[in-house]
């Protein structure tokens, strides 16, 4: 057996920085070619995010409207299909729209299995089935696809681990810059928990207030036997998924994810990762509402944490997962990381995204955390993740 790993990165405009390393890149760089204790081979595909190559205007357009998302999903699927043999373990990682890519890839595998090499010419049929013909989640099996299209796949393939940082499904298009309806063409991707997944981990940003970067949480129902962990961390989108030059805060969710994947068998070179004993709970966070997204400073969106509602006022907005009819969806196994509890109501620095330098210090509090820390109280231990 071997381990087949796909790492899907975000886009350049997720953090406003085109050069700093994300957590996806750092995980990919830390993966051993072989597992030292049992000699298991590990092969890795790293996919740069859409909008990260070409001329600047090309990157702007591609990154903003999500061109290339479909291509990345199909490319990753081809890589897995060309290398997979029964018994292999599959690990998927993603950040931002790369997380959306990784979760969509998991949905494609769950719906169609992994096409056998000699049947890869049927990938367009698998894509069509997943894109436009798939029944409601959890009401299908790969056998439905195989029968319909008379093809063959590894229909019982499983995804050992799916680790994502702050999934963005709405593509992050600045309002008025590009057609608002563009995001709807990506709505077909199945980003709910899928039956082919064994363990899913999702790191979420408490302090991301851009309306077009609202997260896509995993929501009920979850298939039997699928373990889901969704944990909230301090900071903006790039403080959780990486990508800022000042990145000490992003090391916390990176180490959390690395440990979870390692527990499921992934072999990592910890000399390429932060030392777990050196993490800084009071490291600077970032204000992502700048540049193209400066309008969000005047009309911030607050993410609901642990499904605890709170009052917003003026131009503030609250985001909670809803279905197409506006009904609240039940999220799966949300917790708050212990580092957040350690930081709350303590002085901490805030960095400017434009200059990426510390410009101020303030007591760390957040409107969406206020229901969790009433008065001088603290969170129940059951709601805290390590």
At which residue positions do the language-model features occur?
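Active-site- or binding-pocket-proximal scaffold segments within functional domains
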Residues: 1-386
């Amino acid at each position: 057996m071997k381990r087949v790993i796909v790492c899907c990165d975000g886009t350049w405009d997720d953090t406003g920085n085109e050069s700093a390393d994300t957590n996806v890149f750092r995980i990919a760089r830390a993966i051993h070619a072989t597992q030292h204790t049992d000699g298991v081979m590990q092969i890795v595909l790293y996919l740069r995010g859409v909008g990260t190559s070409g001329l600047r205007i090309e990157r702007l357009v591609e990154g903003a409207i999500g061109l290339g998302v479909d291509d990345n999903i199909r490319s990753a699927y081809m890589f897995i299909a060309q290398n997979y043999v029964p018994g292999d373990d599959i690990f998927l990682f993603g950040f931002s729209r790369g997380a959306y890519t990784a979760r969509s890839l998991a949905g494609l595998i769950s719906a169609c299995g992994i096409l056998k090499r000699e049947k890869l010419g049927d990938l367009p049929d698998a894509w069509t089935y997943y894109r436009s013909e798939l029944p409601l989640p959890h009401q299908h099996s790969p056998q439905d696809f195989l029968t319909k299209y008379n093809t063959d796949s590894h229909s019982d393939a499983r995804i050992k681990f799916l680790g994502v940082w702050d999934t963005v499904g709405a593509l992050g298009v600045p309002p008025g810059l590009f057609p608002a309806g563009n995001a709807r063409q990506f709505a077909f991707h199945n980003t709910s928990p899928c039956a082919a997944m064994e363990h899913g981990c999702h790191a979420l940003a408490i302090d991301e207030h851009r309306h077009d970067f609202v997260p896509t949480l995993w929501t009920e129902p979850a298939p039997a036997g699928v373990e889901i962990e969704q944990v909230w961390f301090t900071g903006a989108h790039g403080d959780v998924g990486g990508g800022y030059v000042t990145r000490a805060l992003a090391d916390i969710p990176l180490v959390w994810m690395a440990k979870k994947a390692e527990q499921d068998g992934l072999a990592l070179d910890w000399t390429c990762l932060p030392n777990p004993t050196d993490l800084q709970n009071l490291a600077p966070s970032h204000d992502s509402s700048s540049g193209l997204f400066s309008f969000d400073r005047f009309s911030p969106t607050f993410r609901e944490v642990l499904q605890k509602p709170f009052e917003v006022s003026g131009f503030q907005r609250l985001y909670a997962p809803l279905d197409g009819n506006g009904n609240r969806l039940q999220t799966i196994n949300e917790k708050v990381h212990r580092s957040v509890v350690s930081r709350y109501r303590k002085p901490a620095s805030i960095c400017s995204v434009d200059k990426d330098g510390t410009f101020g210090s303030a007591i760390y509090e957040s409107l969406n955390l206020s229901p969790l820390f009433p008065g001088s109280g603290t969170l129940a231990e059951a709601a805290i993740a390590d």
